[in-house]
Amino acid sequence: MRTVLCFEECLSLAFILLGLRHVERTCPHCKGERTKAHGRYQRLSDGARVARLRCLNCRRTFSKATYDVCFAQKKRHVNHPLWMLLVSGVSLRRVSKILRISRTTSARKLLFLGRVAKRELKESLLHKAKLECVEFDDMETFEHSKCKPLSISLAVESGTRRILGFEVSQMPANGPLAKIAKQRYGRRPDQRLIGRKRLLRFVRKLSKRNVVIKSDENPHYPPLIRGIFPRGEHLRYKGRRGCVVGQGELKRGGFDPLFSLNHTAAMFRANVNRLF
């Protein structure tokens, strides 16, 4: 007897529990609910037998796989191993070699899994209790060159380390690379404020009115947080040096008031290849 669920079954179960899945017997063409069985067919990608249905209103046919999150995918069997490899520090190129698929397929699967995860995260957060304490900060990385830096605005629930959301924004290079970056790539827009606002406005939907927001002493945070959380309390903590060179999320010694956020950021850097 099979007791282990495949990746698609886990996704389907999650969507059912979250109330996101459509009724399988509803016609996708006319939205009619009067349907009858119309045989079965064997799916080429994994050999599964899928039931077909005929709508009694428009007389058109569809299958129970129409509303599946993996609908029309021909390599659904690589979804789970690809997901496990990508969150284990493996690059897209190496994933393609390990699974013997093209880099284009890996990139498309990454986008698909990202959409599913983001949708599931948002729906699960909306059904949780209102937040009382949130930790918020930015971490930095870059695209293909350090002359093109990126800012990742991250918010987590204090104590539980539950990720509430993040936004990736372009930012101009600073320090010794600022002049070189401008010569090579021109002026780079600073979109950090837009990303922070988008993230904090989403967090506001999940939080109590008197929520506590913890952050470091970045001078750009207070006016932004006051505007979005007028009744909230903003606690600021002085930043400290990292305990390892190049890994600023892991703080040196003693009590860390932003441990939930810093630990989450450190896990990102340890398990996502592009953040190494």
Where are these regions (language model features)?
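Residue-level recognition of single "structural anchor" positions
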Residues: 2-276
